[in-house]
Regions:
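Short cysteine-rich clusters marking metal-coordination/redox-active sites
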Residues: 119-123, 181
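Short hydrophobic "helix-edge" motifs at membrane interfaces and signal-peptide entry regions
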Residues: 130-131, 173
Length: 295
Protein backbone atom coordinates (compact mmCIF):
# COMPACT_ATOMS: atom_id res chain seq x y z
CA UNK A 1 0.00 0.00 0.00
CA UNK A 2 1.38 3.41 -1.00
CA UNK A 3 1.93 6.01 1.71
CA UNK A 4 1.45 9.79 1.51
CA UNK A 5 4.27 12.30 1.79
CA UNK A 6 2.01 15.31 2.24
CA UNK A 7 0.45 14.34 5.55
CA UNK A 8 3.52 15.36 7.61
CA UNK A 9 4.20 18.72 5.94
CA UNK A 10 4.73 21.78 8.11
CA UNK A 11 5.57 24.17 5.26
CA UNK A 12 3.05 25.03 2.54
CA UNK A 13 3.29 27.46 -0.39
CA UNK A 14 0.50 29.15 -2.35
CA UNK A 15 -0.58 31.32 -5.21
CA UNK A 16 -2.13 34.19 -3.17
CA UNK A 17 -5.09 34.29 -5.56
CA UNK A 18 -5.98 30.84 -4.17
CA UNK A 19 -4.95 31.18 -0.55
CA UNK A 20 -6.37 27.90 0.74
CA UNK A 21 -5.14 25.64 -2.09
CA UNK A 22 -1.44 24.89 -1.59
CA UNK A 23 0.71 24.42 -4.67
CA UNK A 24 2.95 22.15 -2.65
CA UNK A 25 4.84 21.89 0.59
CA UNK A 26 7.65 20.42 2.60
CA UNK A 27 8.43 18.57 5.81
CA UNK A 28 10.94 20.92 7.41
CA UNK A 29 14.22 19.64 8.80
CA UNK A 30 16.99 21.91 10.19
CA UNK A 31 19.19 21.68 7.07
CA UNK A 32 16.68 23.71 5.03
CA UNK A 33 17.70 27.36 5.02
CA UNK A 34 15.86 30.23 3.39
CA UNK A 35 18.38 30.12 0.56
CA UNK A 36 17.86 26.41 -0.02
CA UNK A 37 14.07 26.73 0.11
CA UNK A 38 14.13 29.44 -2.57
CA UNK A 39 16.40 27.28 -4.74
CA UNK A 40 14.12 24.28 -4.39
CA UNK A 41 11.09 26.39 -5.29
CA UNK A 42 12.80 27.12 -8.61
CA UNK A 43 12.38 23.42 -9.44
CA UNK A 44 8.64 23.48 -8.69
CA UNK A 45 7.40 26.96 -9.60
CA UNK A 46 7.10 28.48 -13.08
CA UNK A 47 6.19 32.14 -13.62
CA UNK A 48 5.93 34.71 -16.39
CA UNK A 49 7.61 37.35 -14.22
CA UNK A 50 10.00 37.55 -11.27
CA UNK A 51 8.39 36.68 -7.95
CA UNK A 52 8.99 37.01 -4.24
CA UNK A 53 8.11 34.65 -1.40
CA UNK A 54 6.41 35.87 1.78
CA UNK A 55 5.79 34.08 5.05
CA UNK A 56 2.25 35.00 6.02
CA UNK A 57 2.13 37.50 8.86
CA UNK A 58 5.53 39.05 8.07
CA UNK A 59 6.40 42.39 6.47
CA UNK A 60 9.34 41.44 4.25
CA UNK A 61 9.92 38.92 1.47
CA UNK A 62 12.14 35.94 2.08
CA UNK A 63 15.80 36.74 1.41
CA UNK A 64 18.31 34.12 0.22
CA UNK A 65 20.19 33.84 3.51
CA UNK A 66 21.54 30.91 5.49
CA UNK A 67 19.05 31.50 8.30
CA UNK A 68 16.87 28.47 9.07
CA UNK A 69 13.54 28.40 7.27
CA UNK A 70 10.48 28.76 9.49
CA UNK A 71 7.50 26.45 9.28
CA UNK A 72 4.27 28.03 8.10
CA UNK A 73 2.38 29.22 5.02
CA UNK A 74 4.21 31.05 2.22
CA UNK A 75 2.71 33.12 -0.60
CA UNK A 76 4.47 33.38 -3.96
CA UNK A 77 3.82 36.87 -5.31
CA UNK A 78 4.56 37.99 -8.88
CA UNK A 79 6.42 41.27 -9.18
CA UNK A 80 4.23 42.70 -11.94
CA UNK A 81 0.43 43.17 -12.04
CA UNK A 82 -1.27 40.28 -13.78
CA UNK A 83 1.72 38.01 -13.34
CA UNK A 84 0.97 34.29 -13.40
CA UNK A 85 2.57 31.43 -11.50
CA UNK A 86 2.02 27.72 -12.01
CA UNK A 87 3.49 24.39 -11.02
CA UNK A 88 5.83 22.56 -13.38
CA UNK A 89 4.45 19.55 -15.20
CA UNK A 90 7.78 17.75 -14.68
CA UNK A 91 7.40 14.63 -12.57
CA UNK A 92 9.93 12.47 -10.79
CA UNK A 93 10.59 9.00 -12.16
CA UNK A 94 8.83 5.92 -10.79
CA UNK A 95 11.83 4.19 -9.26
CA UNK A 96 11.88 0.53 -8.20
CA UNK A 97 14.01 -0.46 -5.23
CA UNK A 98 17.45 -1.50 -6.48
CA UNK A 99 18.73 -5.02 -6.01
CA UNK A 100 22.34 -5.60 -7.07
CA UNK A 101 22.46 -9.35 -7.63
CA UNK A 102 23.72 -10.05 -11.17
CA UNK A 103 27.12 -10.59 -12.75
CA UNK A 104 26.71 -7.25 -14.48
CA UNK A 105 26.58 -5.60 -11.05
CA UNK A 106 29.54 -7.42 -9.54
CA UNK A 107 32.26 -5.09 -10.85
CA UNK A 108 30.20 -2.05 -9.82
CA UNK A 109 29.71 -3.47 -6.34
CA UNK A 110 33.37 -4.34 -5.85
CA UNK A 111 34.60 -0.94 -7.02
CA UNK A 112 32.17 1.02 -4.83
CA UNK A 113 33.13 -1.08 -1.81
CA UNK A 114 36.84 -0.64 -2.49
CA UNK A 115 36.53 3.14 -2.82
CA UNK A 116 34.16 3.89 0.08
CA UNK A 117 34.57 1.13 2.72
CA UNK A 118 31.91 2.83 4.83
CA UNK A 119 28.37 4.16 4.60
CA UNK A 120 29.07 7.54 3.03
CA UNK A 121 25.76 8.90 4.38
CA UNK A 122 26.03 8.00 8.07
CA UNK A 123 29.83 7.71 8.23
CA UNK A 124 29.62 4.21 9.75
CA UNK A 125 32.71 2.19 8.82
CA UNK A 126 32.41 -1.48 7.95
CA UNK A 127 34.78 -3.18 10.44
CA UNK A 128 34.39 -6.50 8.61
CA UNK A 129 35.55 -5.19 5.24
CA UNK A 130 38.97 -6.82 5.63
CA UNK A 131 37.31 -10.27 5.46
CA UNK A 132 34.96 -9.25 2.66
CA UNK A 133 31.84 -9.30 4.85
CA UNK A 134 29.49 -6.57 3.65
CA UNK A 135 26.37 -7.60 5.51
CA UNK A 136 24.00 -4.60 5.80
CA UNK A 137 26.11 -2.51 3.38
CA UNK A 138 24.84 -1.96 -0.17
CA UNK A 139 26.39 -0.43 -3.29
CA UNK A 140 23.59 1.89 -4.42
CA UNK A 141 23.10 3.30 -7.91
CA UNK A 142 22.43 7.05 -7.93
CA UNK A 143 20.84 6.93 -11.38
CA UNK A 144 18.87 3.64 -11.41
CA UNK A 145 19.49 0.76 -13.79
CA UNK A 146 15.77 0.69 -14.54
CA UNK A 147 16.09 4.00 -16.39
CA UNK A 148 19.20 3.30 -18.45
CA UNK A 149 17.49 4.56 -21.62
CA UNK A 150 16.82 7.92 -19.91
CA UNK A 151 20.44 7.94 -18.76
CA UNK A 152 21.48 7.64 -22.40
CA UNK A 153 18.99 10.26 -23.66
CA UNK A 154 20.32 12.78 -21.15
CA UNK A 155 23.81 12.06 -22.51
CA UNK A 156 25.01 11.28 -18.99
CA UNK A 157 27.71 8.81 -20.12
CA UNK A 158 29.70 11.90 -21.16
CA UNK A 159 30.41 12.66 -17.48
CA UNK A 160 31.84 9.23 -16.68
CA UNK A 161 35.61 8.89 -16.93
CA UNK A 162 36.00 5.54 -15.16
CA UNK A 163 34.38 2.65 -17.02
CA UNK A 164 35.11 -0.92 -18.03
CA UNK A 165 35.32 -0.53 -21.83
CA UNK A 166 34.05 1.17 -24.96
CA UNK A 167 30.77 -0.80 -24.97
CA UNK A 168 29.98 0.11 -21.35
CA UNK A 169 27.05 2.56 -21.12
CA UNK A 170 28.63 3.84 -17.87
CA UNK A 171 25.52 3.45 -15.72
CA UNK A 172 27.36 0.68 -13.86
CA UNK A 173 30.45 2.79 -13.29
CA UNK A 174 31.35 3.24 -9.63
CA UNK A 175 31.07 6.97 -10.37
CA UNK A 176 27.30 6.35 -10.36
CA UNK A 177 27.42 4.60 -7.00
CA UNK A 178 27.61 5.16 -3.25
CA UNK A 179 28.06 2.67 -0.42
CA UNK A 180 25.23 2.84 2.13
CA UNK A 181 23.70 0.87 4.94
CA UNK A 182 20.88 -1.20 3.47
CA UNK A 183 18.03 0.69 5.18
CA UNK A 184 19.58 4.01 4.15
CA UNK A 185 19.66 2.71 0.57
CA UNK A 186 15.89 2.17 0.67
CA UNK A 187 15.39 5.74 1.86
CA UNK A 188 17.63 6.99 -0.96
CA UNK A 189 15.69 5.04 -3.59
CA UNK A 190 12.37 6.33 -2.22
CA UNK A 191 13.58 9.96 -2.39
CA UNK A 192 13.37 10.43 1.38
CA UNK A 193 16.68 12.31 1.39
CA UNK A 194 19.13 13.72 -1.12
CA UNK A 195 22.65 15.12 -1.38
CA UNK A 196 23.06 18.65 -2.72
CA UNK A 197 26.39 19.00 -4.56
CA UNK A 198 25.75 22.74 -4.88
CA UNK A 199 25.58 23.14 -1.09
CA UNK A 200 28.89 21.53 -0.16
CA UNK A 201 27.33 18.04 -0.49
CA UNK A 202 24.97 18.63 2.39
CA UNK A 203 22.33 15.96 3.05
CA UNK A 204 18.73 17.10 3.36
CA UNK A 205 15.98 14.85 4.69
CA UNK A 206 12.46 15.34 3.37
CA UNK A 207 10.86 13.10 6.00
CA UNK A 208 11.41 12.23 9.66
CA UNK A 209 15.16 11.94 10.25
CA UNK A 210 15.42 8.61 12.06
CA UNK A 211 19.17 8.22 11.53
CA UNK A 212 20.39 11.74 12.26
CA UNK A 213 21.68 12.31 8.73
CA UNK A 214 19.97 15.65 8.00
CA UNK A 215 22.62 18.36 7.80
CA UNK A 216 25.52 15.91 7.52
CA UNK A 217 27.82 16.06 4.52
CA UNK A 218 28.52 13.31 2.03
CA UNK A 219 31.70 11.59 3.18
CA UNK A 220 34.76 12.95 1.32
CA UNK A 221 36.04 9.43 0.63
CA UNK A 222 33.70 9.09 -2.36
CA UNK A 223 34.23 12.57 -3.82
CA UNK A 224 37.98 13.13 -3.66
CA UNK A 225 38.84 15.26 -6.72
CA UNK A 226 42.13 13.38 -7.00
CA UNK A 227 40.44 9.97 -7.29
CA UNK A 228 39.40 8.95 -10.81
CA UNK A 229 36.62 6.84 -9.25
CA UNK A 230 34.96 9.84 -7.56
CA UNK A 231 31.19 10.20 -7.69
CA UNK A 232 29.78 12.48 -10.42
CA UNK A 233 28.18 15.73 -9.24
CA UNK A 234 25.72 15.78 -12.14
CA UNK A 235 24.21 12.47 -10.99
CA UNK A 236 23.80 13.75 -7.42
CA UNK A 237 22.24 16.92 -8.83
CA UNK A 238 19.76 14.83 -10.84
CA UNK A 239 18.80 12.79 -7.76
CA UNK A 240 18.37 15.96 -5.69
CA UNK A 241 16.00 17.40 -8.31
CA UNK A 242 14.01 14.15 -8.40
CA UNK A 243 13.71 14.26 -4.61
CA UNK A 244 12.45 17.85 -4.62
CA UNK A 245 9.81 16.94 -7.24
CA UNK A 246 8.74 13.85 -5.30
CA UNK A 247 8.35 15.65 -1.99
CA UNK A 248 7.43 19.28 -2.69
CA UNK A 249 5.22 19.32 -5.78
CA UNK A 250 1.45 19.21 -5.27
CA UNK A 251 0.45 16.54 -2.76
CA UNK A 252 3.77 14.75 -3.19
CA UNK A 253 4.42 11.42 -4.85
CA UNK A 254 3.26 8.28 -3.05
CA UNK A 255 5.84 6.26 -1.14
CA UNK A 256 5.71 2.72 -2.45
CA UNK A 257 5.93 -0.42 -0.33
CA UNK A 258 9.46 -1.81 -0.10
CA UNK A 259 9.11 -4.67 2.39
CA UNK A 260 8.61 -7.78 0.26
CA UNK A 261 9.34 -11.07 2.06
CA UNK A 262 10.26 -14.10 -0.05
CA UNK A 263 7.28 -15.29 -2.05
CA UNK A 264 5.58 -11.89 -2.10
CA UNK A 265 3.52 -10.92 -5.14
CA UNK A 266 5.57 -7.88 -6.15
CA UNK A 267 3.85 -7.58 -9.52
CA UNK A 268 0.43 -7.70 -7.88
CA UNK A 269 1.46 -4.97 -5.44
CA UNK A 270 2.63 -2.77 -8.31
CA UNK A 271 -0.44 -3.33 -10.49
CA UNK A 272 -2.82 -2.49 -7.65
CA UNK A 273 -1.02 0.74 -6.73
CA UNK A 274 -0.50 4.21 -8.24
CA UNK A 275 1.60 4.80 -11.38
CA UNK A 276 1.27 1.10 -12.14
CA UNK A 277 2.28 1.25 -15.82
CA UNK A 278 5.41 3.30 -15.15
CA UNK A 279 6.43 1.13 -12.21
CA UNK A 280 5.91 -2.08 -14.18
CA UNK A 281 8.03 -0.72 -17.03
CA UNK A 282 10.77 0.32 -14.58
CA UNK A 283 10.67 -3.08 -12.86
CA UNK A 284 10.89 -4.86 -16.21
CA UNK A 285 13.87 -2.81 -17.39
CA UNK A 286 15.56 -3.31 -14.03
CA UNK A 287 15.26 -7.09 -14.35
CA UNK A 288 16.32 -7.13 -18.01
CA UNK A 289 19.36 -5.03 -17.15
CA UNK A 290 20.52 -7.67 -14.71
CA UNK A 291 20.41 -10.52 -17.22
CA UNK A 292 22.07 -8.62 -20.07
CA UNK A 293 25.68 -9.55 -20.93
CA UNK A 294 28.53 -8.11 -18.92
CA UNK A 295 30.10 -5.30 -20.99
Amino acid sequence: MAMSRGVIRNVHFYDPSRPIEPLGGLYLNPSVTRRKFLRMLEVIICANSPYSVWLRGTDNPLAPTDDPLESGHYDIVCSIPGGIIWVTDERCIARPFSRTVSKRDSRFRQQVRSRDRKCVITGIINPAAYRNDWTSFVAAHIFPLSHEQLFMRLNYPQYVTYRSGETDTAINSCQNGLLMRSHIHKQFDSFSFAIDPDDNYKITCFSEDLDGIDGRFLDPVCRDPGDERRVIDEFLRWHFRQTVLANMKGNGEPIFESDFPDGSDIVGEIVSGPRAAERMEAELFSRLNRISPVP
